Amino acid sequence: MDQLFPTPLANLDPVELVAAETRPAPPDRPWVLVNMVASIDGAIEVEGRSGGLSSRADKAMFHALRQLPDVIMAGAGTVRVENYGPVKLDADAQARRVARGQQALPRLAVVSGRAHLDPASRLFSDPTQRPIVITTTNASSDAVDELRDVADIIFAGSDTVDLRAAFAELREQGMKTLLCEGGPTLNNQLLRDDLVDEWCQTIAPVLTGGNAAQPSTGSPPQVARSLQLARVVVEDDVLLLRYARES
């Protein structure tokens, strides 16, 4: 894995690379990082899943980025399709996190406006890693009650999830960095609410055609957010890009 920008460097360790980057948390919410993989023509899935676009380089960056945050967030649809389970990091990664003053493992947060999640699913299979479910006050009380035994609940918003309010609660709990892994609807809400501080995207050397989903889907924000190119890494024709909010 070689860096082309800002400084050309060869044979980089992605774990060391991302750990050296600065991510200052705002006072009222975590620093929000989105990580996605897409084809050259912008598709984020092949036959409904992102795995068809992944590669050795993308997987290495995916695992490196997962070692950084205090909380990993995904939408309920992504959690179901990708069959999310408890976060796993090796002993060295956990030790590095503890040395930085973090918990050994990041929390996992799932956004579901109606709390329609199966408490018996793999997501909730480890009682030592209780996910956070971010939902609304209008969610079914029966659905919420079923989840209380296996998850911590954050209520934010009534009809739709208020991400800014949810992030304020996470920040109050001491979480300074949040990694969002999609899907595109959740990404779009982050953009509409101007909550994206960093966008990392792997460009797979593939053309898919068709009408596959894009990294962000939905009504566009009123004002487009400009980000600065912060890093370009390449491996085997795969580009790994990092854009960050202007400091």
Enumerate the predicted regions with their spans:
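Enzymes that bind and transform nitrogen-containing heteroaromatic metabolites
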Residues: 1-247
